[in-house]
Structure formats: structure tokens, C-alpha cells
Amino acid sequence: MSKIRAGPKSGRKQLREITRAGQKRVRYDDEATVADLTPDNESDSDNAEPSVAAEREDVEQHRGQAYNALLTLLKSEHPERKHKSNKKIKKDSQRAEEDSPENDGINSEDEQQNIENALDDVSGGVVDEEDMEDSLSDVDESEDESDPFESHFSKYSESRLYAFDKGFKDKTVKYKSSKTDVSEEESLIYSKPCLDDEEVLPVKGKQTLSSYFIKQKLKLANDFQNNGLPLTEIQKELVDPMFQYKDMLYEYDDYADEDQYRDLYSLHALNHVYKTRDRILKNNQKLQENNDEELLDQGFTRPKVLIVVPTRDAAHKIVRKIMEKSGLDQFDKKSKFEDQFFEDSLPPTSKPKSFQHIFQGNTNDFFVLGLKFTRKSLKIYSNFYQSDIIICSPLGIQLILENTDKKKRQDDFLSSIEVMIIDQLHSIEYQNAMHVTTIFQHINKIPEQQREADFSRIRMWYINEQAKFFRQTIVFTKYISPFANSILNGKCRNLAGRWKNHRKIKPEQSSIGQLGLKVRQIFQRFDLAGGTALDEPDYRFKFFTSVIVPSIVKSTGYEDGILLYIPDYTDFIRVRNYLKEKTTIIFGEINEYSNQKQLTSNRARFQHGKVKVLLYTERLHHFRRYEIKNVKSVIFYKPPGNPEFYSEVVRNIGKNVFLGNCDINISTVRCIYSKMDGLSLERVVGSKRAAVLAHGQNEVYEFK
């Protein structure tokens, strides 16, 4: 085997020669679903004729040589990165999986076995025998270079990609932005990575699907009119950046909006999958006519779309949406899917409406599901390596990517993802945000093992580990958070740029504007004194211990009934230890890791005045929405990420006032914040007020 020289353009000729020597092509068996992979279903390959088996063995050996050549190229060009280990984070992550409220009873052996079965290495490449047998009569492919499917993945030369790759590593790539005001309440921001002084214009606003090439099957299935499917106002805002393959971070206003944006991204995902498959099948025909033609149209593995959602209920809604829009009428294992993902149940009506929405239906958060499309049917529970779309929960895919048994770890099926969608990120953050970070650590990596792929047709930007420059990442959340921004700014390198919206909160839309309770609310700012974001927790803790704790000890208001609300669990541990070791304050605590006995006991002790202060975490409030009795004053260690939580917690005072247990003129609400709490603060007090609180001369502001 000749030595392969590393470099931005090297490897193509050698890989083509290695892979396609002899021009042998192998037909593969049908896909193996979770149910089909049981021991009772033995492969027919064991009974194959000796001559056929020998030919397959020769081809497999030949593929192994090709893959070794590929790895030689990749390792010389892209040394393996070493990730810093964080034992504390891993320990907390494991504890969160085992003990968090949303995970009760989900770690079943059956579900783990289903996932392991779906990872079994079975025959079948980017297209398999079933795809090859499909008729090409309805391949309506666009050759128009203005079609984003064409332009996005083919726009950049290898030398230009190499320059961007080097620029990102050297931190010489600069993002240039343009801002468009949609209304008084919302603006759109588009940023594009640049190597030079090119001008960045706003996203072209066509606001209609008719401007984009949609597969004929999807047009017929979705009753497209001459001007395209009628779009809602939200869909008009989203359609252009989405179908132009730009990264997106969208903060929606109402839970009813979810159905609208899912309509759009389901169509986008289907359109991408159908176009990808038909392009490959069409090129297969071209190669039969001219086998020397170079057609680069594939990745390492088949899956092209990854959808991450918090619960099975959300997954069920999305799969049903995909089925509805797919143009197919055959759905394999549909009844099994309904049994495992659908549940007709609602939370108690006494809980807030947002709680009822998030925790309706099947709230199990442990699953990974493969969807495979043929021209006639949708196969649910398909093997992951033969799937076109993978739908998962962060916890479910974490089991695969970071399995405690290193031999069972796999991430090759994520190597060729081109569209990644994270839905309901605000809910996912309360499960375990670290699992989302893990996905980004494993996506678009070079496969560790040989897979069924024709290396002569793999795009060079896959081989050069540059797929991250083309992957579209779409994030939907009810509330934009620093973590959401870190995904868009830190984990996404799409050369098409990134698009986000920003909602301006009017005073009457803010938490204090909708509170309906005339209680004294004091916002106290602490300065970082030149510190960075990494130093912020230390400055906050120092301010709390030096300013807030003395006010608790020498309170001029109520000496008991003080609810201390702490959003972050690590802050909670730090504060709890300080109060225990450094003060004489009698306090209780309830958090997401407390068992039911502790929750009941500590709430009762607080209610009856046996403890002066009760520590309460935001994650516990998200999952339980407790109405805590005997609350006379509230201290927010940090503004809540969800503005509804501010109102819900403060209203505990109002209920206590109604019962005659305290005087609203004596009760107080204190919230400590810094300039870095701008996103949360904006939703609590309103956009204009938040600007004053963050940058004003005063350090204390009061509302009533």
C-alpha cells in the first residue's frame, strides 16, 4: 500500500483506487430493527454458498485495507484531541441520572437492551438493497445552484475550507453581524464567520416555501398550493434561515408555537433526507454509465438528521408530525411505537399551565429511536446505522456515547449528521445540560470502526474532518439562557452563519409586572471588580456572605419564614455548607436529591417555624412546583432562569398574607444579581429596567 500524504487536498485519488479496485459492488440484507435483532432471527449469511461467502470475505478484507488507509490519512492530518477530565462533573452527572426526579423507574434493562440491539453492526451502507430496488421514476432533483441544498454543501473549495479550519484554530476568524428589527418587541441577529472584510447582509427574507425546492412527494402530501404552503407569522420568520441551512437559536413566546415550528422543521428534515437519498440513487445510475466519473455525495454513515428532545411525549408528537408529512402510508412497528411513547395522562390541574404542558403524556426521558425511509414506507425502530433520522433524549444517547462499559461506547452513527435539532432546550437544561455538551463532543467525528461505505464517494470535507462547517444546528427554547448562547457561539461553526432572535420584554410582560402583589422587591447588584465569568460565582458568594447573611441575622423584618431560592446546585452546596459551619442560623433544605421523607419533613418544620430559613433549589421547583407554606420573605440568590418561577415563589408570600400569618408591608423580596444576569433579569423586570439595573450608578433598586 502506497503511503498517503496528508494535506487539505490529499487522499482522494488513493482512496478511490483502493476502494473501487475491481469495481465490485455488494448487495446488502434488509435493515435489522430492534425486534429483528433477537437471537430467533438468524442471519441468512450463515447458509450462504461457499463461493458467495468467499467473495464477501475478499471484499471485506479489501474494505479493511481501504479503511486503514483512510485512518492513516486522518490521523496524520488530525491528531487525536485530549479532553480534560473532570471527575466532579462526571460524579454529579451520574448522581443526577440516578437520583433526579424525572428519572424514576426509567433505567429498565429492556430499554438498554433495545438500544444495544439497535447499535448492532449489520450490513447496509448509506443506501442498501431496499433503496436500490426502489423506482427512480419520481426523482425530481434540482440542479439549480441557487438551491441551498446544492450551494450550502458545495460552495467552498478545499483550499477555502482549509483556510477556515486554520482560521478557527488560530482564532483569526471574525464574526460580522447584521441586525433587523421585526417589531418593537423583537429583533433578528445574523452573524457570519469571515476571513476578510466581506460585507454581511441580513438573511434574505423570502418568507415562503415556494422559494425553495421541495420534493414532489412532500408537496403532494402537504397540499402545496401554487404559492407554497400557507405559513403562519412564526413560520415566515423561521423558513428562510432554516431552509438556507443556517444555524438557529429561536426563543418562542408561547407553548402553542411548538406545533408551528415543528411543522416546519419536520418538513425541512424530510426534504433533506429525501434529497440526500435521491441524489445518491441518481449518481448510482451515472456510475453505471461511466464508472470513472467522480461523484462525491456521501458521508461515512447513513444518519443525516439528529433530533434531541426531553421526553417521549415530545418525541411522539414529532414522529407523528413526520409520519403525517412524509407522503408515506406504511409505517412499520407503528403500534409498538404508540405503546411505548404515547400516554394519555395530564398532571394535576392545580399545577401551573406550563407545568401541565411540560409534564403531560409520557415523561420518560430515556430513549433513542431510529427512523428509516424507503420510497414506500417508514421503518420505526430501525438500526441506528441504517436510519436516516435519529430521535433521542440527552440521557438516552448519553448511555451510548459515554457508557460505563468502554467496550459498548459508540459514536460512529453521529459521524455524518448534517442537521441537528434541539427542541425544548429550556426543559433539557433542567434534566442535565452536560449530556447536550457530550453530544457535541461526539458529533461529526471520524468513525472508529470500518462501516459499509464507498470511500470513493465520501465528500472530502468529511475526510478532512470539516463536517462541522456544514452541519446545521437548530435550537428551540422558551427562554434563551447563557447555556443556549454557549451552544450557538461555542459549539457551532456553520459557514452559512448563525441566526437568532431577541425578544424585548415590556414592563407589563415581566414577572414583577404580572405579579399582582404589592410587596417590596429589592434588587441588589454586586460588581465583579474586573473578574471574568469564571470568577462570578466567587464574587456572588462573597457578596452573599458579607451583605445578605448579616441582614438575615439582624433582620428588621421577619426573623423566620425566609425562603432562600438558589438556582444552581453547586451554589446550593456552597451556601448550605457555609450556613452550617460558619453561622448559627437554624435552617432546613430541600433540593432535587432529597427523598420524599426529607421533602415532607423539612417543609413541615419550616411551616411550623422550627427552622428560620429554608433553602430551595430551582431544579426541584421545576419538577415539583411546590407551594411552600409560611413564607414571609424571599431571597433569590440569583434571578431565576424561568421568569414564571419568580412569580410562583413570591406568590407564596401572598398566600401567607391571605391567611393572616404575615403583613405584606413587612415582608420583602431580595434578589442579588450581577451584569452577567442580564438575560434572566430582563424577563423578571423588563428590558429597559434590566439595562438600568445592570449599568446604572446605583447598586440597589426597589420595586413595589
UniProtKB/Swiss-Prot annotation:
Signal peptide (residue range): none
Biased composition (Basic residues): 81-90
GO cellular component: nucleolus; small-subunit processome
Sequence ranges of Basic and acidic residues compositional bias: 54-63
Feature: compositional bias, Acidic residues: 99-113, 127-148
Location(s), subcellular: Nucleus, Nucleolus
Main subcellular location of this protein, as a coarse class: nucleus
Subunit (UniProt): Component of the ribosomal small subunit (SSU) processome composed of at least 40 protein subunits and snoRNA U3.
Functional summary from the UniProt entry: DEAD-box RNA helicase-like protein required for pre-18S rRNA processing, specifically at sites A0, A1, and A2.
Protein name per the record: U3 small nucleolar RNA-associated protein 25
Organism of this sequence: Kluyveromyces lactis (strain ATCC 8585 / CBS 2359 / DSM 70799 / NBRC 1267 / NRRL Y-1140 / WM37)
Taxonomic placement: Eukaryota, Fungi, Dikarya, Ascomycota, Saccharomycotina
